[in-house]
Amino acid sequence: TVPIGDYTGTETSATHTPDHLFAPGSYTFAVWNPAEGITVNGTTATIAAATGTRAGTDAFVNNALGWFFTYTEQVTIEKDKDYPLTAAMKQQVRELTLVVEPTGDAAGRITEIVAHLTGAAGTLDFATDTYGAASNVVLPFTKITEGDDAGKWKATVRLLGVTGTEQLLTAEIRYADGNPSPTTLKSDLTEALKEFNTGKGKSLTLGGTLVETPEGMEVDGAEINGWEEVKGDDVNADL
């Protein structure tokens, strides 16, 4: 989509020639592609609300966005002159993966980790790189059953960015037969995600150890010990 002033065009090839005569003046030249879970008004992208069990609750937004690219430039147009413009598209969605390694005698009894992350950006003005609407996203943890990481739990989401003063992971860890009782997990990811909004062309994987998984029926809660970046293949997209 190519909006310029009161003109909006749609292009599917590498070049776009507007069939439109622009009055002399200053314009914001913007280019962006349609992406799942994202709507655009002017130069502000807004994430759709979450669906499913979290729909309409506590400002939860979509956690599986399509790949979204943008470009903006301020241009001054003079009368009777053609302007060739090149749009170097910028990736605006980044993939985040969290890998958790449970420890303790009850680690093997974990059946489910119900979790969400706070401080995800719900909007982005891509002309000014302004993130807003601090929102929550579901972290869909599943157990890894094969390979070197078997026994760990992993969640992958795609985010427009992070915003606000903090990003907190909150979860309830559930066990087979209700033994032990569910454990509450809270972990601060603010420091680990402080550079998340830069370098979006590279995926980010963070790993941490869950200590200490409770034993028996007594539950005091759990925490993640030392989030660290896990190096792996970059995940990006070509427009």
Language model segments and positions:
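Structured interaction patches on ligand/partner-binding surfaces of diverse proteins
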Residues: 37-84, 178-212
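Intrinsically disordered, low-complexity segments enriched in small/polar residues
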Residues: 206-226
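Structural motif
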Residues: 99-108
